[in-house]
A protein has these predicted regions:
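Class I S-adenosyl-L-methionine-dependent methyltransferase catalytic core
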Residues: 1-183
Length: 186
């Protein structure tokens, strides 16, 4: 696994062995970032269930301003991969329960332009992640949440204020793009 393009292009990323981490494949990441296009540039990124950090580090390599990477078990791997890519200055690693970190980020008043969420497949956390991010108001008004799930899992078309706007399947993975809709009623 490697960074595909940008300032850290070609940098190999370390991956944990036997911890149940399922890194997003290079091909899937390449397609994802092609769809995101210029949205990545200067973005504030949050990577939930970060694992190896490949998604956030790819975004930073492509010009994102800052990224927060959250994972319960792979903190040392995240730090090593940020060091390898020379992106430590703009990568903030947080170790702990994803939902606890979502609450902490909300308490700090943080918002993000781009949120990646890649919970373990078939764990049933997809709706919970959307609900937690929505309740914490972490997504900026014009932001995008990208949810990776198993291809066989049910697609969540609406959850709270989130609506699915696009989905693509890549092998065993399905990438769902969700926007946050707010009511402008006076």
């Amino acid at each position: 696994m490697r960074i595909i393009t940008g300032s850290a292009r070609g940098t190999r990323l370390k991956s944990p062995v036997g911890e149940g981490t399922r890194p997003t494949a290079d091909r899937t990441r390449e397609a994802l970032f092609s769809m995101l296009g210029a949205r990545v540039y200067d973005a504030r990124v949050l990577d939930l269930f970060a694992g190896t950090g490949a998604l956030a580090l790819e975004a930073l390599s492509r010009g994102a301003a800052h990224a927060v990477l959250v994972d319960r078990v792979t903190h040392a791997i995240l730090a090593e991969n940020a060091r390898r890519t020379k992106l430590t200055a703009c990568a903030e690693m947080r170790r702990g329960d994803v939902y606890g970190q979502i609450a902490a980020l909300a308490e700090e008043g943080r918002t993000f332009d781009l949120i990646f969420a890649d919970p373990p497949y078939a764990c049933g956390d997809n709706a919970r992640v959307l609900a937690a991010v929505d309740a914490a108001a972490l997504l900026a008004a014009d932001g995008l949440l990208v949810l990776e799930q198993g291809a066989g899992e049910a697609i969540i078309e609406h959850s709270g204020r989130f609506s699915l706007v696009r989905e693509r399947r890549y092998g065993a993975a399905r990438i769902c793009f969700c926007l946050l809709y707010t009511s402008d009623a006076a």
